[in-house]
Structures are given as C-alpha cells and as structure tokens.
Amino acid sequence: MGTDSENPVLRNVLISFNLLLLGAVLKPFECRLEVTTEPAERPAVDEEGGLANCSPPVKEQPMVFHHIYNINVPVDSCCSSMLRSSAEEVSSEDDRLAEYTEQTSDSESQVTFTHRINLPKQACKCSTSLPSLQELLSRIEMLEREVSMLRDQCNSNCCQENAATGRLDYTLPCSGHGNFSLESCRCICSEGWAGSNCSEPRCPRGCSSRGVCLEGQCVCDNDYGGEDCSQLRCPAGCGSRGLCVDGECICEEGFGGEDCSQPRCPRDCSGRGHCDNGTCVCAEGYAGEDCGWLRCPNACSGRGVCQDGLCICEDGYGGQDCSAVAPPENLRVTGISDGSIELAWDSLGAATEYVVSYQPAGPGGSQLQQRVPGDWSTITITELEPGVAYNVSIYAVISDVLSSPVTTKVTTNLATPQGLKFKTITETTVEVQWEPFSFPFDGWEISFIPKNNEGGVIAQLPSTVTTFNQTGLKPGEEYTVTVVALKDQARSPPASDSISTLIDGPTQILVRDVSDTVAFVEWTPPRARVDAILLKYGLADGEGGRTTFRLQPPLSQYSLQALRPGARYHLAVSALRGANESQPALAQFTTEIDAPKNLRVGSRTPASLELTWDNSEAEAHSYRVVYSTLAGEHYHEVLVPRDTGPTTRATLADLVPGTEYGIGISAVMDSQQSVPATMNARTELDSPRDLLVTASTETSISLSWTKAMGPIDHYRVTFTPASGMASEVTVSRNESQLTLSELEPGTEYTISIIAERGRQQSLEATVDAFTGVRPITQLHFSQLTSSSVNITWSDPSPPADRLVLTYSPRDEEAPQQLALDGTRRHASLTGLRPSTEYLVSLVAVHGAVSSEPVTGSITTGMDAPKDLRVGNITQDSMVIYWSPPVAPFDHYRISYRAAEGRTDSTAIGNDATEYIMRLLQPATKYEIGVKSVRGREESEVASITTYTAMDAPLGVTATNITPTEALLQWNPPLMDVESYVLVLTRHTGETILVDGINQEYQLTNLQPSTTYTVAMYATNGPLTSQTISTNFTTLLDPPTNLTASEVTRRSALLSWVPPVGDIENYILTYRSTDGSRKELIVDAEDTWIRLEGLSETTQYTVRLQAAQNAMRSGFISTTFTTGGRVFANPQDCAQHLMNGDTLSGVYTISINGDLSQRVQVFCDMSTDGGGWIVFQRRQNGLTDFFRKWADYRVGFGNLEDEFWLGLDNIHKITSQGRYELRIDMRDGQEAAYAYYDKFSVGDSRSLYKLRIGDYNGTSGDSLTYHQGRPFSTKDRDNDVAVTNCAMSYKGAWWYKNCHRTNLNGKYGESRHSQGINWYHWKGHEFSIPFVEMKMRPYNHRNISGRKRRSLQL
C-alpha cells in the first residue's frame, strides 16, 4: 500500500475501516462482515462539486468503487428479525440501520471510492467472543488487493497524465476465479473453475460421469454426447430419417423402427391388425387401409348401408343385418271411450299392411285381429266392452313377413251413467235415479258437492243400486250431483246435474202477547241462506186482502200493529231467495175485543139512566152492562144488542132515584169479552107523581100526589096566580095531600111540586087550577100546512075527566074523533087534505056530563112538488126532477141561487116534471127551490142543495224517475182546489192527499223496477173532479255496499247487498291496470262471488250492476290489489299461507319445491295460526278405513271429506324438515287436542316408522306409546302382539301391543278398543266422531310472526 501523500483515497479508506474496527472492539458480538465491491462508472463532477453529464471515451471513463460493509447478526440469532439486507431500503426511522458513509474523490482523478458501513441500530449480544483479528486482517488484504487491481487498470491509457502510481503488496488469492472464505479459510471458486486456488478449468457438470474432462471440455462415452455428456445417442443416428430425442428416434412420416429404417403402416393399422412391409393385415371384423372400418353382419342382407359396423336399414327393415321387418314405431293411444280405442303410430313407407291384434287382459278372453293397409297410421278398435283392459299388439307386414309386435295395454273407459234424474226433492233430501249398466262392474260412487265446495257427501253403492236417497243436505243449497261407475281403479266419466234443495222456512212459529190491536210473532229462522223473510197476515174471511212484510233474514220476531180488534187472523211466515219461496209456517190467532169507548150518560131520570157509547171496532154482537150502587147493593147485569150505527144506547131502568151507580160495559163476541169501560152516574131525584086538583072552591084548591120513591128531605109546593106573585109552602116527605087556602076567587093558579134532598131537586110536577068554575072558550090553530095543523086550548076548571076532539072536511058528514086525556092542552092533526076546509070541535067531559062544544075551522095550504132530486150534473149544467103535487095549481116556479150570487127564477107549465139548468158555474153550490102556484097562492117550497161538477186537473206526468222516487206534475183546474187526491196503485192502492195550492208531488219509498199507476182528482169540499191517470215504471236499483275481502295473490271475494227490486241477474266487470277486462253474469240470488285466476300484485277495478230484461241499473264499484307470492312453488300449507292463501281447502304442494313431485293436500288455514297439512280426517264413517297396505301407502278417500293422505306422501313431506303434529278431536260441543313438537314418518324400508316429540295439549298423551313403531295393516302385520292388531281392531296404525290410540279404527264402534279411540281422553269404549291429524313446519309460528311484523313495518 502506498504512502498517505501518494494515495489519499486509500488513506481515507483505512481511516474508515479503523473506525469500524474500533466499534467492533468496543461492542463485541458474533457477527459476519461482508464487503462487496461494485465497480461503476462515475459521472463527471463539475467545478462546483456537482455531477456533470460528461461522457468520456470508453477507455477513459472514470471508475467508481463502492465498498459496502454489512455487519450482520447470525441467521439463528434471536434478533435477526430486526435486521435487513444491505441492499434493502429502510422505510422508517426506528428500523433503519445505523449507516456511515464516506466518499473520497480526487478532482484530478477519475477514481472515486465510496465506503458505506451498515450496522444494525439494535442488535443482540453475540453468543461468542470478538471475531479474530485474523479475519479482520483478511478483509484488509482483500481491500489492498482491489487497490492493486485498480492500479493496473488506471494506466496511461485511461488516466492519462493523472494515472495513479503505487505498488502491489498483495497477490490475488483464488487465482482471480473465486472468493476466499474467512469461515472455511479456502477458495470458493467461480463457475467453471476448480482447484485449491481456483486455477483449474472445470467441465460442465463433471461430464455427468459419462466422460472424461480434458482442459475444461468433456470427452463423452460412446452412448452419450452433448457438452456435459448428458444426452443419449440414438441408434444409427436415426438414419437421417428422424430426430433423436432422449435417445429415441422420432421418425419421419412413413418410417419406423428403432433407427427409423423400417417402412410404417397408416395409423399403425388402428390397433386392429398388423403391419406387413407397410401394408395393414386387419383382424376379423375390420377392414380399410388402416383397419379403421367395422364390417357389418351379413353385409346388411342387401337391405341397408353399413356405417361404422352398423347397418343403416332401408325403410321397413331392421335388425343387426337388416334381415327383419321393422315394427311400427311410436305407438300411442289417442282416444279412449267406453266402447272403443283409438291408436296411432308412425307409418313405415315399405309396409304393405299392418296387423292389429287385441284381446282382454284377463283370462278367458278371445283374441281378435284387424288388418289395415300399409299407408294407414291410425285405427279405431270398436265394439269393445266398457271398463276392460285390453292387450293390443301391432305388426308391420312386408311380403307376408311379420315384424315383431309393438304392444300396449289399454283399458276402455267405463260408460257414462245415463238417465240421471231427480225423483223427489225436499229441504234436506234428494232422491236420485239413473239407468243400470248391462256389463259387470264394481259399483257406483255418487257425490253431492255444494256450490261453494264446502263439505259435500260422497257415497259408494253396489252395482245393483240405481236409486239413492241422500239425506242430511243443507236447505236451500245448490248441489252438483255426480254419479260415477267404478271398476278396479277405473272411474267412468261422470254424469252430473245440478239441483237445489228447497229452502226451509221458519219453524216453531209462536204468536203471543195478543191484544185488541197488537200481536207479537216469533219463529225459528231457516237454516238456508235466504234473501228475505216474508210475513203475510190477513183476516180469516179474506176481507181486505193480505198484508205482506219483507223482513231481513236475521229477524226472527215481529210485532203486528193496527190489527182489527176481535178479528181472526191467518198468519204465514216463509223464506224467500230469488224467486223461490219456502213452505210457510202457519198460525192463527184472534185479537181481543176492544172495549166500547166514550161512555157517557145521554139523559137521566129518577129511575133510569140512558147510556150512550161508541161501538167497539170489533164486530161485537152485544154488550154486557153491569151496574150496581156504590155500596154494592142492587147488582144487575144486562146484555144489550149492538146498534147498527156508530153508537149504541141502553137505558138502565128501575133504578133507585137519587142514587150513584157504578157502571161497567164490556163488548161480547162469541165467547170473548173485552175489558170493561167504566163510569159512575147518579139518578135524578124522582118527582111526586100524579099531581091532581082534587077540589076547588072560591078560595081554595085541594091537591094530591104520589110520593117520591127515593130518599128525600121534603116537598116544596109553589103556586102562582095570574098576577104573578108566587107563593110556596114546604110539605113533609111523609105527606101526599095539600089544600091551598085563602086564594083569590076566580083566579087561575099554576101549581108545581118538587122533592128536595139537600141541594138536589127533582123535576117539578105542575098543574093549572082555577078557583071556582071555568070552561074551555076557544081553540087556537097554529103551524098550518097542506096536511097538518096544531090545536091548543086553555084548562077547564074544574079539570075535565077526558076531552073529545072532532074534525072533518066541511062538505063531508063522517067526522073523525080523537079521545084525549083530561089533562091534555094541545093536539096535532095530520094526514089532512091539501087546500081543504076543515071543521074542528072540542068537548070536555066531567063524569057523565059533557060541556058545550068549542068549534073552529081551518083551510089547509097547497102541497109542494115531491121527491125533488138532481141528476146529470156537469161543470155548467144539471137536471132537476120532481113529482107533481096533489092540489090543483096553475104553474111551477123554479128558483136557484149560487152560494154567493143572485137568485134566478123561472115559471114552467104545470105538466112538467123536470127542468134543465144551464150556464152554471163549475164547482159552485146551488140552492134550488120548486113550488106550485095557483093565483096568488103558493105552496111550500121543495128545496135541494147541490154542486156543479169541478173541472179536472190536466196533463199529469211522472218525471225525474229513480229506483225509489218519481216527481208527479200537473196543470191545475180553473176553479179553486182544496186538495188533490192521488191514488198510487201497484198491487194495492195507496191514497195520498195533496194540498190544492201544489202542482207537483214527490213520490218516495217506491219499489224499484215496478210499474205504478197514478190516478188523481181534485176536491173542493164535497166536490170532486173527473179522474185522470198516468203510468210509469221506476228504474232498477243497483246493488249496494260492494266490498272486496279475502284478497290473495290470485283471488278475491266480492260481496254486496242485493237491490230491493226483482232482478234477472248481475253483470260484473273487472279490469286490471294493464287494460285487460272480463265480464261475468252472476245469478240473481247470489250476493257474493270469488274471482279466481287473477294476476299477482295487480290492481283491479270492479263494477257491478243489476239487470232485468233490457233494463240496467246504475253501477257500483270498488278497487283492490292482489298480493304477491312469497314462495313460487310452496312445499307445504304453511308456505301457501304465507303466500296469502288464507282459506282452508284443497291446495297443491311441491315436495322440496320440485314441480315434478306435486301432491294435492287439504290445508287448514284457521286452527292455531293455520298452515296445517291435514293428512287424516274421520267425520261420518262414509269411507272405509279397514284397508290393505297398498291403500295406506298411496292414500285414499276424498280430501274434502274422510281421507288418508298416504304414507309415502307423509314421509316425503316430513323429510323436508322438522314438522310438528296436531290432532284435533271433537264430540259435539266438547273438543280436545294433542300437540307434539316433532313428527316424522320413515320410508318404506323402515315400514314407515313413527317418530314424535314432546307432548302438549288437552287430550292427554296417548300417542307416545306408539313411538318408533312401524305401520301395520290387515295384510302387513308389523306389531309386536301375538295377534294381528289391525285385524283385531279393524284399522291400520302404528300398533305396538296393541294400542293406546287407534284413530283409523272403525267409525262409530263403541266396543272396547274397536272404534276411533284416544285412551287418555275418552277411553277405549268410546268412538270419537270427529278426528283430524295435521302437520306443519315446526318453526311456522315464528316465521309467520316475523312475516307479519315485517308487513306491519
């Protein structure tokens, strides 16, 4: 190494290295120092010390030496993870290596030394002591070696005048072909060198031990070659006909062998032959240049083409060698009836004909054949037996050679039952009859399915039965009756017809709380769905017709009002649906008699009371009058006949004067009697009777009388002279005579006597008396008419015993006499002749002495016309009629006057008996008088009052007509109108009174779709106009309250309230948002319909109107939106329920969602949250459950009645996941259930073993006893009992030894363990009438609950 002045660069390197050694001495650890020298070009350095872009010639490029010293921790050190390679970039301050860099450069030199020493910032202690100084010195020697090499390079050619000088103090170790390892103290040679000092050239891979290395080159053995003798040599060098690869020859096309010297066959004869000098000799069955073709058998018999060893036969031939006639292909059944089979096949063009052979599949059937031409491909075999399985074979024929047959087995249909008809129909029964079959079969199945598909009845009958009476049907229900013939597993096409049972009417009708005008009716409603209850009642004799009320169906009672008292009524209550009316429930009742009303006293006397009352409305024939004194004495009862007028009178006689009586009057009709109408009344005090003047003097008058019968205090006698000064005297009640004295002589006295009791006074008895003697002096005539006269006279004194009145016409000698009582003071003469003079005389008789007669004369007046009457009255005229008078006269005078107007009169001849009055005013009251006239004398006036007729209103019309209203309008008459009378007629008339100022009237509460006749006339007082009329028909009222409910994905239930009027049907139209529209005709009796087949998540608008003939009502409408489907292919009823199918019924599920495994099941969507698959039901015993293994495996029965779903289906369903089991049992109103939280049935290999979980419920646990048991039937005994449990207990079950429950036992059998038993509920001696077994997914309740909550959110 040179001096410091000579080589400052080296000096700097040594300084740095010494620092490194010092650090190593101060902090010893076991490390490994690696020094790497990297020669590189140095960029030029500018004057300021920066780098310049200078590119000297190649030989003069500067040299840069980078020395990197990495002091590394050994690999096995625990701290090695903290160190990084020298070449890595350090990314963070904490993990960076401690780096010391020094750069030494000479501006005059083109050599730069860079020293970078990397020390780990953190290092663990080395496990050994400080490295030996020898190793460090070796590093220094290496450094000086590199410096010596640098001197050699930097000669005058590259460094020019700045060439470095120095001396070589160190020889190169490892000959410059390797590195010296301080660890092993030996050379590690570079590739291609070897030896202790790496001075010996080395052969590649040591010639692979297959040759000798000479001066670095391999001399290979004979069979090998290549640079390293690793390649195999090929035989003969492949003879220039191939390529040597890994010692094997890849020969050119057409040559082969190890050395490619042999000719080669095409494709090596495909492995189906051997190559002979380039030519293939093929094995048997192959041919071709390369033996690639297959030979065909028998050269395809000349009837085909050989391809790939297979014969492609000509039409009509087949087989491996085309030697056989080909059978028809694709034989199929295209039609089956009860007597024929239609077959089709693919025709072969070469066939000359086909032979069709068929015979019954059962034993003993004869074989029949038919031949058809070869161009046929269909045939219909006829005249077959219904319900028979036939084996059918078809042969193709070519040149009398038959092909092998193609066969099929076909069963003809059973014939459709014929002649289905209904013999008798009641509310709950239908008797059906049909025609028998002439061929053997197993039996009949008849079903009665209601229109709403809820319930239904199915019965199986022997083949000999052709009539059937089905009982227990619902009244008023439409049923589809279907009759099907059965044979083996076949069913005939159904014969069906619809029939409706009669609607049942109300029953147990009861009439109670009957009074005179009210009766209360109760009944039991009908079971059938009806539109209305008709209540009809009327009088038993038919008077007044019948009144009908149309009541709403829920009503079961009604109060009849405004009845006629005492009348017998007939009552009928029936049900109505559409035009069908049930048989009525009949009753009769009689209203009570109403009591007489307005009881009053018309007149009273001391011994009588005259009673008057208004008659009862009832046709009472008499009245029972009961009366007695208030003290209860003198009780009397009398029966009084009913008067013909509105009132009846009765006089109670022989009463005690001055006494108060209690009176009760009841109406009596037959055996009925009304409640009494009561009152109190008092008789008058009776007067003294027979008051007589017994004697008379100049100053006194003696009187006598008969005493009053009633209790009195005294008598009061009043006497009054003509001068008018009255006097009175009181007489004891015990006296009956009195003499009045000190009277004025020759004076007339008026004497009266009354009886008194307290303030009550009797009527007075009066008599006129005269002191001294006074005869009758004059007759007085008054009220003279053409036929009568009144005569009065004064009292004689003393009083006469009797009076004799004599009268006669003047010119007649035969007078007439009247004998009168001496007390009489007047008389009336009647029946006299008109215009005749009469002589009248009166004689008073005293004992045997008669007074002188007192005489007078009169002349009667003219008689008036008789029988005056009016006829032919019009608005402005009328005719009066009369009969002529008796007395002669000159003419008639007729006068008439309006109520407010002048009087007109006219004279007509005496021979007239009628007269026409004209030019009168309409609706005017006229007073008409007719009298006869003779000279100046006129008769009395015969008069009559009448009215001219009113003019009628005009142009009555009905406008603004609706279903329940119409407006009547008219033009009024000319005269004033007090009121209009409208008579509105449908079936019966209704009278309406309208004020006369109106010219229109609004009719309301009309019946829709009804024709009305309106007649009207005007009235004014007693006057009425002519009647005018019009007709109109109300519009059809629409249904109301259209509602959509039970909306699911594909259906919705529409319901409505029917219109009031009669209709023919409904027109229902529904339209979706996409514009599609459908119209349905719905029967009139329906009030709901379920729309099916709707689109999911679609809004529908529904419009409904009623129709009657060509009439249409208005529309009502509603909208609804169908739901979406959660499960595209539901695998159980729970998924159907979550799809929105909420109605219980028959659904289709897909096992595991696979559409190819569809099963029809009955879903219970209501019990305990719904979603149950019902797999067994017992309810009426119509289905036989004592069946074989095959039946229980596949299932049987009617899903809507009694059935068993089938063990295979139950296994498949329960294999979908965890299911729970519920068993519902009912006995009348009593119910119980059992619940098991796990349920599964094994497959057929396990004999359908039962697996159930924990029990819960109300019935007790009777099923756990059967846990793990296989299923047993009468023909598969899998129980552990000595006997066959299924045979012993007439069922099929998971029997053990034998059972605690037997839900498939015999229906209705109560013998021990023989029926449908559940031991822990009803024991073994009770057959449960209703059982349902059902299953659903165990987590359904949670899932459905989450679904509902999500929908709410």
Curated annotation (Swiss-Prot):
Disulfide-bonded cysteine pairs: these are 296-306, 313-322
Q: Gene that codes for this?
A: TNR
- Domain (EGF-like) ranges: 187-198, 234-260, 265-291, 292-323
Q: Describe tissue expression.
A: Brain specific.
Q: In which organism is this protein found?
A: Gallus gallus
Task: Return the protein name.
Answer: Tenascin-R
Query: What keywords are annotated for this sequence in UniProt?
Result: Cell adhesion, Coiled coil, Disulfide bond, EGF-like domain, Extracellular matrix, Glycoprotein, Repeat, Secreted, Signal
Any notes on this protein's domains? The N-terminus cysteine-rich segment may mediate the formation of oligomers. The fibronectin type-III 2-3 mediate the binding to contactin 1. The fibronectin type-III 9 mediates the cell attachment. The fibronectin type-III 2-5 mediate NFASC binding. The fibrinogen C-terminal domain mediates interaction with CSPG5.
InterPro entries the record matches: ECM_Regulatory_Proteins, EGF-like_dom, EGF_Tenascin, Fibrinogen-like_C, Fibrinogen_a/b/g_C_1, Fibrinogen_a/b/g_C_dom, FN3_dom, FN3_sf
